Structures are given as structure tokens and as C-alpha cells.
A protein has these predicted regions:
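Hydrophobic alpha-helical transmembrane segments of multipass membrane transporters and ion channels
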Residues: 30-37, 110-127, 161-169
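Residue-level signature of catalytic and energy-coupling elements of molecular machines
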Residues: 29, 43, 79, 126, ...
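Extended, hydrophilic extramembrane loops/domains of integral membrane proteins
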Residues: 1-16, 88
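Pore-lining and gate-forming transmembrane alpha-helices of multi-pass membrane transport proteins
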Residues: 36, 150-181
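Predominantly long cytosolic amphipathic alpha-helical stalk/bundle segments
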Residues: 54-146, 175-208
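Hydrophobic alpha-helical transmembrane segments
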Residues: 23-62
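Alpha-helical transmembrane segments
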Residues: 37, 41-45, 128-131, 135, ...
């Protein structure tokens, strides 16, 4: 559009009247604020879990290089079960090792379910805000009429803000869930691998 043309003045006025990001955010209303709060919580939760799992992973890697099982890391606690039960049969040891791995699972997977729920609920909250905003817009049209297309378009635009916010929360949360889950599963794989190896060694020794 040519700013110097016949419609240039209207175009420039539209640019000037374009809401800022903060104003757009406020247009989302209470639902928008709730979505933002949920998103901030998901981000903080994911960061905390990544830090915790990184520390656990470092401790597990250190345990792999150590000949002495220590109770300050998940793998060490699993290995201690074998050391504390040197004379039990292979089947019982396998059950005890599986139980030890299961005891560590909740600590490793903590927060994953919550992140998944937030990723699913955020778009629905956005849709709720949009539907509510559309209802308010059409109620206003019913009362005041549709004589001003700009007002109608502005109301619809404001209603759609919550959908955008919901997606802006859901998409990063899905990615964060994938990262956190990947780190947790990596540690779980090491625990299962080491537990299976110990049971296999015990079974081989018993066979000899």
C-alpha cells in the first residue's frame, strides 16, 4: 500500500493503532493470564527437572566408573541390592533388582505427567477464552448492531489472542517434555542394563 495514496492515511492510522505485544497479552483477559501462569510454571518445572536429571546422570556415570556402590545415586542403590544379598538364588535376585529399579522410577519420571497435562490443557484453555470472547463479541453486536465492522473485527481479534497464547505454551511444553523424558529414559536404560547384567552374572556363576 502506498502511504501517499488515497488510502495511505487510513493505512498509517491502522499501523499507529496496532496494539503492542503487552496490549495484546492484556486482551486475553483472565484466561490469558491463567495460560501465561501455567506456561511459566511448566517452564520452571522443566528447568528444575533438567537440572536434577543432569545431576543424577553425572552421579550415575560416576558410579559406572567406581567399583564401590554408593547410596547417593540411583545406580548405586540398585547395585547395593546385589551386594546386600550375595547368597540368594537368581530368581529372587532378579525380583529384588526389578523392585529396586521400580523404586527409582518415580524419582526419575517426576514432573513428566504434569508437563504432558499442561501441554494438552493449554490449547483447550485458549479455545475456552476464544469461545468466551466470541460470545461477548456477538452479544455486543446483538445489542449495538453490526454498523461498525472495525469494532466487530477488533472483538474477534481479541478473542483469538487466547488461542495464540495456548499454542505458545503448548508447543514449547511438548518440546520440554521430550527433553526431560529423554534424560529420564537414558538413566532408566542404564539402571535396567546394569541390573540385567548383574542377574546374568549371578546366573552364570550359579551354573558353574
Amino acid at each position: 500500500i502506498d502511504p501517499t495514496g488515497p488510502t495511505g492515511g487510513s493505512f498509517l492510522a491502522a499501523i499507529i493503532d496496532t496494539p503492542t505485544l503487552e496490549e495484546r497479552w492484556h486482551q486475553g483477559g483472565y484466561v490469558g493470564y491463567a495460560i501465561t501462569t501455567v506456561g511459566a510454571f511448566a517452564f520452571l518445572l522443566a528447568i528444575v527437572r533438567v537440572i536434577m536429571l543432569t545431576m543424577m546422570g553425572a552421579a550415575v556415570n560416576s558410579q559406572l566408573k567406581s567399583g564401590e556402590a554408593k547410596a547417593n545415586n540411583p545406580l548405586g542403590r540398585v547395585l547395593l541390592v546385589s551386594q546386600e544379598n550375595p547368597n540368594i538364588d537368581t530368581e529372587t535376585l532378579e525380583l529384588k533388582m526389578a523392585e529396586a529399579v521400580l523404586r527409582e522410577t518415580p524419582k526419575l519420571e517426576s514432573g513428566l505427567t504434569l508437563l504432558k497435562i499442561i501441554a494438552a490443557v493449554a490449547p483447550l484453555m485458549g479455545l475456552l477464552g476464544t469461545v468466551t470472547g466470541m460470545i461477548i463479541t456477538f452479544q455486543a453486536i446483538t445489542i449495538f448492531g453490526a454498523g461498525d465492522p472495525k469494532a466487530m473485527a477488533g472483538g474477534i481479534s481479541s478473542a483469538l489472542i487466547t488461542t495464540v497464547l495456548g499454542l505458545l505454551v503448548a508447543i514449547p511444553t511438548v518440546l520440554l517434555h521430550t527433553v526431560v523424558n529423554g534424560r529420564a529414559q537414558k538413566i532408566m536404560h542404564i539402571l535396567n542394563e546394569q541390573a540385567t547384567g548383574i542377574v546374568a552374572e549371578r546366573a552364570e556363576a550359579a551354573g558353574n
